[in-house]
Amino acid sequence: MSGDETTTLHLAKQAEKTGIKTKRLTVSHAFHSPHMQPILDDFLHTAHTLTYHQPTTPIISNLTGNPAGDEITTPDYWANHIRNTVLFHQTITTLTNHNVVRYLEIGPTGTLTALAHTTHPHATHIPTQRPNRHQPTTLTTALTHTHNTGHTPTWNTLIPHTPHHPPPHLPLPTPPLLGRNRTHRGR
């Protein structure tokens, strides 16, 4: 839910009374709600200065929960995105129905990773950043986990190194039965 704080807190309490789990997000504004209306003119002005291209990877629209079409390459689509409800559950369900089993969250926290896990718990959910953690290490750990779950990143473009800047130490995932951490030290 997004909107007026008093109303959303009341609705969250009512939902929890009926057994529906809720999580309050730490955000500065009521994003994806009519509360974004005051910035829409400025947003659209800036959005019209950008050049849009058809995506080369299929995208599921958060506004419909279905595969996005040409509308995703318009400023109006993105203005609607910041003002209207995000259909997160439907989006993850559609991705699940398209056999998506790995989610890599590109963002400042792991909030969406945790939310996706509640919708599709059998998939792999990988955040690329975590609050109050060393960002390069967190990103490298996420990419290592991505590799270990079946997708190999192009490492040399992600972690370039020279004799003066050797590759960083990579924390390797704990083997499931050993319970000990391993560290790979680059040469």
Regions found by a protein language model. Name each.
Residues 1-106, 110-112, 161:
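Acyltransferase
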Residues 67, 73, 77-187:
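Flexible, low-complexity segments
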